[in-house]
Amino acid sequence: MWPAQLLSQLLPLWPLLLLPLSLPAQGSSHRSPPAPARPPCVRGGPSAPRHVCVWERAPPPSRSPRVPRSRRQVLPGTAPPATPSGFEEGPPSSQYPWAIVWGPTVSREDGGDPNSVNPGFLPLDYGFAAPHGLATPHPNSDSMRDDGDGLILGETPATLRPFLFGGRGEGVDPQLYVTITISIIIVLVATGIIFKFCWDRSQKRRRPSGQQGALRQEESQQPLTDLSPAGVTVLGAFGDSPTPTPDHEEPRGGPRPGMPQPKGAPAFQLNR
């Protein structure tokens, strides 16, 4: 019984099993046709020492019909465009931010205005100020002179004058001279203050050294004996206590006659 039940359950699943088999068959129909097989190897001739295989070269792959926009064919009768390829619609700002678009140039013979065709640039007959006051034409102008050797010589443009040595009537701001004068005065005053400070400091250093030298000289000239009205005392070697001199010592026998002896004062003894 169970095989019959199993077959009855598997019968509805047969279409699902046939579905994957039909998909590869449909996909194979869309594939490109297989490449032609190469011809077999043929013998070149009876005189050839060995078999030579001649193969036919396959044709090169066909290129896509797409052509880049920048590459355009130029007909033999037409002139190439004035602007570079790819710039007909204007230079892109993201790809070439540093590109400069030059305008057309018109010569004087054609009757064009050189100032209008070259905006932002100096005119062709622009003159420079010369040191002696004359106007020097531009080297590219028609007023150039020709020397005997056939060389075209033009006067070189004069360099700009320094503003400090030029005339005051040439449009220099007078405030500039006032600023320079005040700056010079400030520098001179600051230099004088610094010099005065250094001089006072050097004098203060010399005074203490002079005083110390005077004190040392006085100490060297001071005598070893001390002259006093009471008597002459000699400074001892081991102390400052005065020692009586032999001239003021009393005689051994006693006081001299005629000398008043103080009351209550004991007699001076030699052997203390």
Curated annotation (Swiss-Prot):
<dbReference type="GO" id="GO:0035176">
    <property type="term" value="P:social behavior"/>
</dbReference>
<feature type="transmembrane region" description="Helical">
    <location>
        <begin position="175"/>
        <end position="195"/>
    </location>
</feature>
<feature type="topological domain" description="Cytoplasmic">
    <location>
        <begin position="196"/>
        <end position="272"/>
    </location>
</feature>
<dbReference type="GO" id="GO:0021542">
    <property type="term" value="P:dentate gyrus development"/>
</dbReference>
<dbReference type="GO" id="GO:0008542">
    <property type="term" value="P:visual learning"/>
</dbReference>
<dbReference type="GO" id="GO:0048872">
    <property type="term" value="P:homeostasis of number of cells"/>
</dbReference>
<keyword id="KW-0732">Signal</keyword>
<feature type="compositionally biased region" description="Polar residues">
    <location>
        <begin position="209"/>
        <end position="225"/>
    </location>
</feature>
<dbReference type="GO" id="GO:0098793">
    <property type="term" value="C:presynapse"/>
</dbReference>
<dbReference type="GO" id="GO:0014047">
    <property type="term" value="P:glutamate secretion"/>
</dbReference>
<keyword id="KW-0325">Glycoprotein</keyword>
<dbReference type="InterPro" id="IPR029198">
    <property type="entry name" value="AJAP1_PANP_C"/>
</dbReference>
<feature type="topological domain" description="Extracellular">
    <location>
        <begin position="28"/>
        <end position="174"/>
    </location>
</feature>
<dbReference type="GO" id="GO:0010467">
    <property type="term" value="P:gene expression"/>
</dbReference>
<comment type="function">
    <text>Acts as a ligand for PILRA in neuronal tissues, where it may be involved in immune regulation.</text>
</comment>
<dbReference type="GO" id="GO:0007214">
    <property type="term" value="P:gamma-aminobutyric acid signaling pathway"/>
</dbReference>
<dbReference type="GO" id="GO:0019904">
    <property type="term" value="F:protein domain specific binding"/>
</dbReference>
<keyword id="KW-1133">Transmembrane helix</keyword>
<dbReference type="GO" id="GO:0016020">
    <property type="term" value="C:membrane"/>
</dbReference>
<protein>
    <recommendedName>
        <fullName>PILR alpha-associated neural protein</fullName>
    </recommendedName>
</protein>
<dbReference type="InterPro" id="IPR039628">
    <property type="entry name" value="PIANP"/>
</dbReference>
<feature type="glycosylation site" description="O-linked (GalNAc...) threonine">
    <location>
        <position position="136"/>
    </location>
</feature>
<dbReference type="GO" id="GO:0021549">
    <property type="term" value="P:cerebellum development"/>
</dbReference>
<feature type="signal peptide">
    <location>
        <begin position="1"/>
        <end position="27"/>
    </location>
</feature>
<feature type="region of interest" description="Disordered">
    <location>
        <begin position="205"/>
        <end position="272"/>
    </location>
</feature>
<dbReference type="GO" id="GO:0006950">
    <property type="term" value="P:response to stress"/>
</dbReference>
<dbReference type="GO" id="GO:0050776">
    <property type="term" value="P:regulation of immune response"/>
</dbReference>
<dbReference type="Pfam" id="PF15298">
    <property type="entry name" value="AJAP1_PANP_C"/>
</dbReference>
<keyword id="KW-0472">Membrane</keyword>
<feature type="region of interest" description="Disordered">
    <location>
        <begin position="25"/>
        <end position="93"/>
    </location>
</feature>
<dbReference type="GO" id="GO:0016323">
    <property type="term" value="C:basolateral plasma membrane"/>
</dbReference>
<keyword id="KW-0812">Transmembrane</keyword>
